[in-house]
Amino acid sequence: MKRPDYRTLQALDAVIRERGFERAAQKLCITQSAVSQRIKQLENLFGQPLLVRTIPPHPTEQGQKLLALLHQVELLEEEWLGSDTPLLLSLAVNADSLATWLLPALKPVLSDLPIRLNLQVEDETRTQERLRRGEVVGAVSIQPQPLPSCLVDRLGALDYLFVASPSFAARYFPNGVTRSALLKAPAVAFDHLDDMHQSFLQQNFDLSPGSVPCHIVNSSEAFVQLARQGTTCCMIPHLQIERELEQRELIDLTPGLYQRRMLYWHRFAPESRMMRKVTDALLDHGHQVLRQD
């Protein structure tokens, strides 16, 4: 049986986390040559490449499996052996969860457990991929099916409303939200792969993707600010703008129409006791504040 030296696995992990050999060497306090040598030893052991040497580097399928193994072992070692330093807990989460329910959910964990969070923000359609690559030990995703050797539980749903300020609505939709009016109304997306706004308009107004002018802003909080100041219309989780809706700073442009995103919590199996506490905290709070119907 091939048993890797965990020093070599840590070198592979550092190259992925630090997005290159130079920063990995600095992180491990060794030379770049030593980092390369350790990874080459690991590749020789398994008889195949474990790292695709692009910029930034990324692991091969076998490399992903080894990184997942390393992260599981680190969690289990922390549980049984303890440590003088907080354990790094890397999670892939979507920006809207981070802006709404996730941090309150993690409050008891951060208060009671010796951990350091490394939250990697990614669209909820792509967070599971980071878990598959071994970059994180847990992920909030819209995918209901678990990866091999992983566990999954349903958290609940975020309902997205199509909103704008009253002044924006008066300017762009004086006769209501129509197909022709939408073609002139500036919108906003999180990144070039964020298709929620386009999907909503295509489904409800038969507008083809790319037909609506759209800003790109990588911030959930900025969506709210842009909408409040009257410069865009956009899809925002109801949970994030309850106060703004109540005070009429924002209005629902299409009452009765919304986009629902069911969220799931994925993590490696078996869970350490520490990871089980993280799971319990996320599920307990998620079931309280997210839609369960």
Swiss-Prot record:
Residues 21-40 bind DNA. The keyword Nucleotidyltransferase does not apply. InterPro entries: ArgP, ArgP_gammaproteobact, LTTR, LysR_subst-bd, Tscrpt_reg_HTH_LysR, WH-like_DNA-bd_sf, WH_DNA-bd_sf. It holds the Pfam family HTH_1. Residues 4-60 form the HTH lysR-type domain. Signal peptide: none annotated. One of its GO terms (molecular function) is DNA-binding transcription factor activity. Keywords: DNA-binding, Transcription, Transcription regulation. CDD domains: PBP2_IciA_ArgP (cd08428). SUPFAM superfamilies: Periplasmic binding protein-like II (SSF53850), Winged helix' DNA-binding domain (SSF46785). The keyword Transcription regulation applies. Controls the transcription of genes involved in arginine and lysine metabolism. Homodimer. Belongs to the LysR transcriptional regulatory family. This is HTH-type transcriptional regulator ArgP. The lineage of its organism: Bacteria, Pseudomonadati, Pseudomonadota, Gammaproteobacteria, Enterobacterales.
